[in-house]
């Protein structure tokens, strides 16, 4: 203690001594400052060290909207921002600019008309869009309405005298006009929509004195101008799973089918139209429905059908082009979309809202996580502004300052419905996740994308818009050949459209392309029995309607019933999954694929083929992850079974079936046709003495045993007679008559062979082979040659594996196409007309509709400039035709669809012809570097898109062009990278082991000694012929690598790169890989709803989202805001938003506040004024503080000055002369 006190006193004394020194105070102050600075530096070093050690905890996972760590959920610790594009359609300044742009377009149109020598004020009549029907169960019926009415005494048989188009009419009705009962119209009923559509098109040319309209049917009897159809009725209430007319007809009660002449199913509306025999039948059906009329436990409802033909009297037209605030009204979708981000995606780092300078009135601009970006901030060429085109704006959003490399782009009408994570968009293992929907619109009418570059010159595709059928109509390729739609062609994401025969040329259902089957999308057009319910894509609910076969380990032959086209094989009890599958190419195959999700193998067959066998080679993976290979055959016979109790005319064997397409050719006279061929022949067939095959029933398949057991039960119960029993049993056992004898003989030979010794067996086999060679027998009759195998598509095989599997050529396909090139081209050309008339019903979320407008700007959704753009394009086309008589142009129908076709043509020219689909309307994750690379690839096209003031037919569609560039870009093979991959020890020189690895990569397995010696000889020859400055052999130590062959030089990277024979083999063995990884996703998590003005329909759409929440929700506003029900629809929509996201987000101001400025220019001017005011205010405050201090502490300041700067004192005793 004494020592401590002594040290303290010493420290005190030294401190006083230092302070009493002349410069002691300065030293103390300097030491204090140095200590503070050192403390800060030390703290900074500590923080940096802690950040380096715990940067994951401090930065990546907490740098987000929520400000908390998502370390347990995020798989990508990278910052991800969100970009919105938003506009306020009710802004007065914006409406003025829109009027100015429209006026400018009208002036350009007027100038074009003057150049053509036409009246500048004359407007060409443009095709107007059909108004929307807002009535309940409103459908277009098979009815034509003629105004004024035909003579009252005319009959249906006399209609062809007026016009040949009416020859297919089945009924004629004289109907009084509801609003004018004194006058009437004539309603013509047809059997189908196709007949009505064709009659409408043809009658417009013949009957110029009558107005011909299509008739509409509805159940809403309260609407004005309706006429009840007594022989038509609506049927509803049946299960929605019934997608085909025949399915519904079979299940309907007899009381309904007995009173109907025809049934038409509208699966999209879940209703059916009944053509009744008499008017009394409707009364009987309604009474029966009140008692008991059910189908699969559901009550059926029969309703009256009301006819109307004037849609303008029912609903208001959507062609009103007046510029009004209500037309482009904002429903505050952005507010609720931001709430969905805070609720379901709080890991987002920052939110950028791109506007034309507008500011949402409710947006909290003080929030550091949100920023408003104007067009001036991102457009490189300011002369392109102002712009009212969404593609032009989207072209520049990746140039936002401070934007993350990967960002998510959303429109304001898109939001999240469930928790979303970055791996929903991108993962390091599989790359970008691409969500695709409906196909790109056809390049020309009647020319689907699957016809382009398929080896045939198709008439409908032989035009400039389709690049002359992708080259099929130019040169020798027009006569057939290996097209782009066969397996192995196209991109890895392009699935095979079929296997053998005509599978790629005919569809299993109207509107269901073969390439849509098993493509991981549930296509509505393919979700029917004829297509096997999209072969597993639409779940397993309807698999019970297909023929099921259970695979067994020890069974190698399965036999299908005659006429069966849609079987599937279940391996649930056999293995866990299928890792690889091959099938022998066969003409009867339409499609086959594996669905590991349901543990099934699906098979679709073409009808009308004789008995044959399909051979499978499947690699299964058991539950313990051990692979085993199973080979089996399927015996098929797709000819239809003969129908009993019916007589059919005998068709001449040499006659080819003619397509049922109406042609203007004259009728063929029947004088030259023999009498025996002018009528049907009655086949006299007696069933009295039916020969039932006697077989060993224990060897029959289980399915046949079950059918025989049921047949015996029916006979014992008296349901069938002996004759029927024998006839049915003979039909069941007929396919196994010859097969059973061969099976028994094979089993017997097998038993005898097992009794012999191995030497005796070998001697017998050689003797048998020798005898067969001497007699010239064909051994292949008993054991067929293993056919060429093609890979089978598997649902969960990765993209890389799929491309590897599908890179196998089909040797029989080219020969088959060459044989059928003549008649197939003719059939397709004739069928194209039928394809135009009978449009497919489309796919849910996968069909193009002109109302499905992808622009986020409200005037694009309302098609405000559409009429002007169509007129300008028509005039430009006419001007081009005037200048060049040989030029032809395609009439613009829809700007968005034409821009898709335009981009598709560019992609075809850059990456090759293939079928493409449009990305879903949902949030898209974009990589800035990839987007910049895309724009560097098409610089002129993107610059042209940026220059368009309004949407144009030659715009580069943002998501479509980006994702297909990402999926199509190819990484050129780099020999240096291949060398580095093989050089596993990174020594720069390949060893003997590594040379063998190289040999396995460039040669087929198994390797032979000749393969290795030839490779070594190539390297030796190249080392002698190439200069040393290329091979760098002199830089390698002689002892670095020792080879078995002493003459072998060191295999350096330079030697491999410059050795031409080696590089050629490497290029042949190593294919160019995709530059970017990607994964095709389904649409299970996407909910796209087109919100129109029908209140009940909108409520049903929103309730569907409530019941089935999805991750990505888009409510596309297509409301007619001037309609009387628009307010109700918007209220329902607002109520839905509030029910989904009731809590305000941090990006909103309180409800009682709103932004003072609604434009960025006003805000920026105010901020400049604020900053200036703040600067001068600070200056004044500093001045006041200085004067105040000087006034109150004047004496102290003088003393401080004297103390800091003391005067020098002159000593009185100092005498310079004194020594």
UniProtKB/Swiss-Prot annotation:
User: Sorted alphabetically, which Gene3D superfamilies does this protein's record hold?
Assistant: 3.30.300.320
Q: What happens biologically when this protein's gene is inactivated, per the record?
A: Decreased mannose phosphorylation of lysosomal acid hydrolases, craniofacial and cardiac defects. Impaired development of pectoral fins and otic vesicles. Craniofacial defects are due to changes in the timing and localization of both type II collagen and sox9 expression, suggestive of an accelerated chondrocyte differentiation program. Increased level of active cathepsin K (ctsk) 3 days post-fertilization (dpf) because of abnormal processing and activation, leading to morphologic cartilage defects.
Disulfide bond positions: 443-466, 457-473, 508-531, 522-538
**Organism superkingdom:** Eukaryota
Sequence positions that bind Ca(2+)? 454, 469, 472, 519, 534, 537, 983, 985, 987, 994
Catalysed reaction(s)? N(4)-[alpha-D-mannosyl-(1->2)-alpha-D-mannosyl-(glycan)]-L-asparaginyl-[protein] + UDP-N-acetyl-alpha-D-glucosamine = N(4)-[6-(N-acetyl-alpha-D-glucosaminyl-1-phospho)-alpha-D-mannosyl-(1->2)-alpha-D-mannosyl-(glycan)]-L-asparaginyl-[protein] + UMP + H(+)
Write out the ranges of the annotated region (Disordered). Answer: 640-666
E.C. number? 2.7.8.17
Q: Which UniProt keywords are given for this protein, alphabetically ordered?
A: Calcium, Disulfide bond, Glycoprotein, Golgi apparatus, Membrane, Metal-binding, Repeat, Signal-anchor, Transferase, Transmembrane, Transmembrane helix
> Would you list which residues are glycosylated?
88, 119, 153, 292, 381, 462, 554, 610, 617, 645, 696, 726, 823, 974, 1021, 1029, 1094
Cite the position(s) of the site with description Cleavage. Answer: 893-894
Name the GO terms of the biological process aspect.
Answer: bone development; carbohydrate phosphorylation; cartilage development; chondrocyte development; embryonic cranial skeleton morphogenesis; embryonic viscerocranium morphogenesis; heart morphogenesis; lysosome organization
The annotated subunit structure for this chain is: Hexamer of two alpha, two beta and two gamma (GNPTG) subunits; disulfide-linked. The alpha and/or the beta subunits of the enzyme constitute the catalytic subunits.
Protein's job: Catalyzes the formation of mannose 6-phosphate (M6P) markers on high mannose type oligosaccharides in the Golgi apparatus. M6P residues are required to bind to the M6P receptors (MPR), which mediate the vesicular transport of lysosomal enzymes to the endosomal/prelysosomal compartment.
Q: What is this protein called?
A: N-acetylglucosamine-1-phosphotransferase subunits alpha/beta
């Amino acid at each position: 203690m004494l020592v401590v006190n002594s040290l303290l006193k010493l420290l005190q004394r030294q401190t006083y001594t230092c302070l009493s020194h002349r410069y002691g105070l300065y030293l103390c102050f300097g030491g204090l400052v140095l200590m503070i600075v050192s403390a800060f530096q030390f703290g900074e070093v500590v923080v940096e060290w802690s950040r380096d050690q715990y940067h994951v905890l401090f930065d990546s996972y907490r740098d987000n909207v929520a400000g908390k760590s998502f370390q347990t959920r995020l798989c990508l610790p990278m910052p991800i921002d969100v970009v919105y594009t938003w506009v306020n359609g009710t802004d007065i300044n914006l409406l003025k600019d829109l009027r100015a742009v429209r006026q400018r377009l009208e002036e350009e149109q007027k100038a074009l008309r003057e150049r053509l020598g036409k009246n500048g004020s004359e407007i060409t009549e443009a095709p107007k869009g059909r108004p929307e029907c807002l009535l309940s169960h409103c459908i277009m019926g098979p009815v034509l309405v003629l105004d004024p009415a035909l003579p009252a005494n005319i009959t249906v048989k006399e209609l062809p005298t007026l016009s040949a188009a009416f020859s297919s009419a089945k009924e004629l009705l004289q109907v009084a006009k509801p609003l004018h009962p004194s006058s009437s119209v004539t309603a013509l009923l047809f059997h189908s929509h196709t007949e009505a559509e064709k009659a409408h098109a043809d009658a417009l040319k013949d009957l110029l004195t009558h107005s011909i309209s299509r008739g509409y049917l509805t159940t809403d009897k309260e609407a004005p101008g309706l006429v009840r159809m007594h022989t038509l009725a609506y049927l509803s209430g049946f299960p929605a799973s019934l997608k085909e007319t025949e399915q519904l007809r079979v299940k309907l009660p007899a009381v309904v089918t007995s009173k109907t002449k025809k049934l038409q199913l509208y699966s999209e509306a879940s209703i059916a139209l009944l053509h009744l025999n008499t008017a009394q039948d409707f009364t009987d059906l309604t009474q029966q429905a009140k008692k008991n009329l059910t189908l699969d436990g559901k009550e059926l409802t029969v309703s009256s059908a009301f006819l109307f033909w004037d849609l303008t009297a029912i609903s208001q037209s959507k062609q009103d082009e007046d510029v009004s605030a209500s037309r482009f009204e904002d429903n505050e979708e952005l507010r609720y979309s931001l709430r969905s981000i805070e609720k379901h995606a709080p890991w987002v780092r920052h939110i950028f809202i791109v506007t034309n300078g507008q500011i949402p009135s409710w947006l909290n601009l003080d929030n550091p996580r949100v920023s408003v970006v104007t067009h001036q901030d991102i457009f490189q060429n300011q002369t392109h502004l102002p712009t009212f085109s969404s593609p032009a704006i989207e072209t520049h959003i990746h140039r936002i300052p401070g934007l993350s490399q990967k960002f998510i782009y959303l429109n304001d009408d898109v939001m999240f419905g469930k928790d979303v994570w970055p791996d929903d968009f991108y993962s390091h293992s599989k790359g970008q996740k691409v969500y695709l929907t409906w196909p790109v619109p056809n390049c020309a009418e009647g020319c689907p994308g699957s016809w382009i570059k398929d080896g045939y010159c198709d008439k409908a595709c032989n035009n400039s818009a389709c690049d002359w059928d992708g080259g099929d109509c130019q040169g020798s390729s027009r006569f057939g050949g290996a097209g782009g739609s066969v397996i192995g062609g196209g991109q890895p994401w392009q699935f095979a459209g079929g296997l053998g025969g005509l599978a790629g040329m005919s569809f299993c259902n109207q509107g269901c392309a073969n390439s849509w089957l098993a493509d991981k999308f549930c296509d509505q057009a393919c979700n029917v029995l004829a297509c096997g319910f999209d072969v597993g894509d639409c779940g397993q609910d309807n698999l019970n309607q297909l023929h099921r076969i259970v695979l067994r380990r020890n069974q190698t032959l399965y036999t299908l019933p005659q006429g069966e086209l849609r079987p599937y094989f279940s391996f649930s009890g056999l293995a866990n999954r299928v890792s690889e599958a091959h099938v022998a190419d066969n003409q009867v195959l339409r499609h086959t694929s594996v669905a590991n999700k349901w543990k099934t193998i699906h098979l679709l067959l073409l009808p009308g083929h004789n008995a044959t066998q399909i051979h499978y080679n499947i690699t299964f993976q058991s539950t313990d992850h051990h692979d085993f290979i199973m080979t089996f055959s399927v015996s098929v016979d797709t000819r239809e079974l003969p129908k009993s109790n019916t007589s059919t005319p005998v068709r001449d064997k040499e006659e080819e079936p003619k397509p049922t397409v109406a042609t203007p050719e004259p009728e063929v006279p029947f004088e030259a046709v023999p009498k025996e061929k002018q009528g049907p022949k009655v086949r006299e067939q007696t069933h009295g003495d039916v020969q039932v095959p006697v077989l060993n029933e224990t060897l029959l398949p289980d399915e046949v045993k079950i059918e025989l057991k049921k047949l015996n039960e029916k006979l014992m119960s008296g349901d069938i007679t002996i004759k029927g029993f024998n006839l049915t049993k003979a039909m069941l056992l007929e396919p196994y008559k010859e097969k059973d004898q061969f099976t028994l003989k094979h089993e017997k030979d097998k038993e005898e062979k097992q009794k012999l010794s191995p030497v005796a067996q070998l001697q017998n086999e050689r003797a048998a082979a020798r005898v067969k060679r001497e007699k010239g027998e064909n051994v292949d009759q008993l054991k067929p040659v293993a056919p060429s195998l093609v890979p089978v598509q598997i649902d969960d095989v990765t993209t890389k594996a799929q491309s590897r599997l599908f890179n196998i050529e089909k040797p029989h396909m080219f020969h088959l196409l060459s044989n059928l090139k003549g008649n197939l081209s003719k059939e397709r050309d004739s069928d194209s007309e039928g394809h135009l008339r009978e449009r497919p019903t489309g796919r849910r979320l996968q069909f193009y509709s002109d109302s499905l407008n992808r622009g986020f700007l409200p005037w694009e959704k309302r098609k405000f400039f559409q009429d002007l753009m169509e007129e300008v394009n028509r005039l430009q086309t006419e001007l081009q035709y005037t200048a060049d008589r040989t030029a032809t142009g395609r009439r613009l129908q829809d700007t968005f669809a034409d821009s898709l076709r335009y981009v598709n043509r560019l992609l075809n020219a850059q990456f090759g012809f293939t079928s493409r689909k449009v990305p879903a309307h949902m949030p898209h994750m974009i990589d800035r570097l990839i987007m910049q690379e895309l724009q560097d690839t098409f610089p002129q096209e993107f610059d042209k898109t940026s220059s368009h003031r309004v949407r144009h037919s030659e715009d580069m569609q943002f998501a479509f062009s980006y994702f297909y560039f990402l999926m199509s870009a190819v990484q050129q093979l780099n020999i240096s990278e291949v060398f580095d991959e093989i050089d596993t020890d990174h020594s720069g020189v390949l060893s003997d082991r590594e040379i063998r690895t190289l040999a396995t990569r460039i040669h087929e397995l198994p390797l032979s000694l000749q393969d290795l010696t030839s490779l070594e000889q190539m390297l030796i020859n190249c080392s002698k012929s190439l200069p040393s400055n290329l091979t760098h052999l002199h830089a390698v130590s002689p002892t670095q690598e020792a080879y078995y062959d002493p003459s072998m030089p060191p295999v350096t990277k330079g030697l491999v790169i410059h050795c031409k024979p080696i590089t050629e083999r490497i290029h042949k063995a190593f294919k160019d890989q995709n530059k970017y990884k990607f994964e095709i996703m389904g649409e299970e998590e996407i909910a796209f709803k087109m919100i129109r003005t029908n209140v009940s329909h909108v409520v049903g759409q929103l309730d569907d989202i409530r019941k089935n929440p999805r991750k990505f929700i888009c409510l596309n506003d297509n409301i007619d805001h001037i309609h009387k029900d628009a307010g109700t629809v918007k209220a329902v929509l607002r109520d839905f938003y509030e029910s989904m996201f009731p809590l305000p987000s941090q990006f909103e101001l309180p409800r009682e506040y709103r932004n003072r400025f609604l434009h960025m220019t006003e805000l920026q001017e105010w901020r400049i004024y604020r900053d200036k005011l703040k600067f001068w205010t600070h200056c004044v405050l500093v001045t006041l503080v200085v004067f105040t201090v000087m006034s109150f502490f004047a004496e102290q300041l003088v003393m401080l000055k004297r103390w800091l700067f003391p005067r020098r004192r002159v000593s009185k005793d100092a005498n310079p002369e004194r020594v």
